[in-house]
From Swiss-Prot:
GO molecular function annotations of the record: ATP binding; isomerase activity
Parts of the chain that traverse the membrane: none
InterPro entries membership: CBS_dom, CBS_dom_sf, KdsD/KpsF-type, SIS_dom, SIS_dom_sf, SIS_Kpsf
Keyword line: ATP-binding, CBS domain, Nucleotide-binding, Repeat
SUPFAM superfamilies, per database record: SIS domain (SSF53697)
Organism: Chlamydia muridarum (strain MoPn / Nigg)
NCBIfam families: kpsF
Residues that bind ATP: 52-57
Assigned protein family: Belongs to the SIS family. GutQ/KpsF subfamily.
PROSITE patterns tied to this protein: CBS, SIS
Keyword ATP-binding: yes
Pfam family, one: CBS
Entry protein name: Uncharacterized protein TC_0679
Length: 328
């Protein structure tokens, strides 16, 4: 029978237990082993294999997928290793095996055959005296923490620890490799990640034909007609060659009215415009544009300039456009 109050109490109890055990993980895990393992991976020329049985295997698969996404030669060894899959392993390869207990039967059966291949064996376990720890060339010792279930048997906390280690290792390798957004995007052309990683400003800008332009000599009063005719909240101040001289926004107008009153309406734009606004090149990554909008003094629109000269305006990049594209 479902009792809401009981379910709520149990949920809160498990939630607090999660917080406690995760805190103990961070207090007891020595991340220097990640540094050492990263250094070996960076110097390694061959393949790197990860594997595990059951839930540990799921964590190994996830780590492989993450590392492959930024170009690492990482592969998953299936449970059929001794039924032919051993053929992909070569001398000198690195093989990393996940086992919380360090006594997983299938894993222990693999070890002699992997040793015969002269691999560098990495054991990732929570049991320092386990067979996996003893026979490994390098050991990643994860904190031994109790599981969340009443029997202390169901892989919950242990797999969370494995996942935290995996993400730390993958991101350390990524940072050391100095993987750029462009590098990552080449391996991830599809989905929302692909849109963010590969999108260029030119793909999202409003073209020059839709940009509100004004001459620097017209008054603020005259510019208001242009400003109110478009939905950008700004006008771009340009010369006859469409070189960007500055920008005037509705925020500039409010500040001017507050400081100068109605007299600002008769001022020429060149006296009140922002002369060095944030701009972005049309061939820049769209995520750079989003970062520029949100950093410093936040803005919702960026003038886009040509890639060659970096001064002729070719369009506008608007926050609303990026939101509609699902990039926020």
């Amino acid at each position: 029978m479902y009792v809401p109050d009981v379910a709520e109490d149990l949920c809160l109890d498990i939630f607090h237990k999660q917080k406690q055990v995760i805190s103990r993980y961070f207090a007891n895990f020595h991340c220097d082993v990640v540094r050492q393992l990263t250094e070996r991976l960076l110097c390694h020329q061959g393949a790197v294999f990860f594997s595990g049985i059951g839930k540990s295997g799921c964590i190994a698969r996830k780590l492989v997928a993450t590392m492959q996404s930024f170009g690492e030669k990482a592969f998953f060894l299936s449970g059929d290793l001794l039924h032919g899959d051993l053929g992909v392993v070569s001398s000198g390869d690195i093989v990393c095996l996940f086992s919380n207990s360090g006594e997983t039967r299938e894993i222990l059966e693999w070890i002699p055959h992997l040793k015969n291949r002269q691999v560098f064996l990495v054991g990732i376990t929570s049991s320092p005296c386990s067979s996996l720890a003893v026979f490994s060339d390098f050991v990643v010792m994860l904190p031994k923490l109790e599981e969340l279930d009443p029997f202390n048997l169901i892989p919950t906390t242990s797999t969370t620890c494995q996942l935290l280690f995996s993400d730390l290792l993958a991101m350390t390798v990524l940072r050391c490799r100095k993987i750029s957004l462009s590098d990552y995007g080449k391996n991830h052309p599809s989905g929302q990640i692909g849109l963010k990683a590969n999108g260029k400003v030119r793909d999202y800008l409003s073209p020059r034909t839709e940009v509100p332009f004004c001459s620097p000599s017209i008054t603020v009063s005259e510019a208001l007609t242009v400003l109110s005719s478009y939905g950008y909240g700004c006008v771009c101040v340009v010369n006859e060659q469409f070189e960007l001289l500055g920008i005037f926004t509705d925020g500039d107008l409010r500040r001017g009215l507050s400081e100068c009153g109605g007299a600002i309406l008769e001022c020429p734009l060149e006296q009140v415009m922002t002369r060095k606004p944030k701009v972005i090149s049309e061939d820049s990554d769209v995520l750079l544009g989003l970062e520029m909008m949100e950093s410093g003094n936040p803005v919702t629109v960026l003038p886009v300039v040509d890639a060659q000269h970096q001064r002729f305006i070719v369009g506008l990049l608007h926050m609303h456009t990026l939101a509609r594209a699902g990039l926020l």
